[in-house]
C-alpha cells in the first residue's frame, strides 16, 4: 500500500499549514499508534502507516516524534474501542485486571497487540529513529479502559509493556513518558522511576467550553516536586497555550 495515500495527506494538513505560515516545522510532532491493534482475525482493521510517517518526518526534518497509543480492544458487543461506557457511546467493557492475568483471553489479546507494536518500534529502530512513547496516557482520568479499574492493574500493565518492549523484544530507542497528575491519589498511579524517563501533563484547562490560556505553573511545579526534581516534565497535550 502507498504510504502517501489521501489519508496520509490529511494527517499532514496541520503541519503543511504551519510550514506555509511560518516557514518552519515544529521541533516535536505527536503521532498516534491508534490503528495498531489486531481484530478477531489477527489482522489490522485499518492502516494509517503511523510508524512510516514517524520515520519520514524525523528523517526529513530532524525533529522528535512522540508516540501515544489510543489502544483499542474488543468489547462484549463486538466492537473495538478505548473509551469506557461513561465516556463515549463507542466504548469497551474490556477488563484490564483480566488483561494482566496470565491464562486469560484478555491477556492473550494484549500480548498479541504488544507484539504488533514491538514490530513497529523495531521498524523505527532499524531506521535509526528514537521516539518518546507515552503509553496508557491519562489513566487517572478513568475514561480509558486502562484506567477503569484503579491504579494497581494499570501500573502492572505499564510495567508489563515496558518489560516486553525493553527486555523481551530488546528495543532501546524508546524514551518512556508517563502522564502524571497532582491529585492526592496520583502517587499510586505512578509506575516507578525505573520505567519512566519523562513526566507529561495533558493541559486541558476549559471553563464553560472556553479554553483558559493560564500557564497553570503550579501544576507543573507540583509534577517536578512529585519526583523530587529527578524527572523532566513536559506539556504532552494542550488546548490553549
Question: At which residue positions do the language-model features occur?
Answer:
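Aromatic-lined carbohydrate-recognition surfaces of secreted/lumenal glycan-active proteins
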Residues: 1-2, 134-136, 140, 158-185, ...
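N-terminal module-boundary/linker segments of secreted carbohydrate-active enzymes
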Residues: 1-48, 55
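Solvent-exposed loop/turn segments at secondary-structure junctions
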Residues: 2-5, 34-37, 71-74, 137-141, ...
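Alpha-helical scaffolding within the catalytic cores
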Residues: 9-18, 49-52, 116-120, 179-191, ...
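Extracellular/periplasmic catalytic domains that process cell-envelope and extracellular macromolecules
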Residues: 20-24, 57-60, 124-128, 169-171, ...
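Structural recognition of the beta-strand scaffold that forms the well-ordered cores
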Residues: 26-33, 64-69, 131-135, 175-179, ...
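Substrate-binding cleft of extracellular glycoside hydrolase catalytic domains
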Residues: 34-171
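Glycoside hydrolase catalytic-domain groove-lining segments
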Residues: 183-241
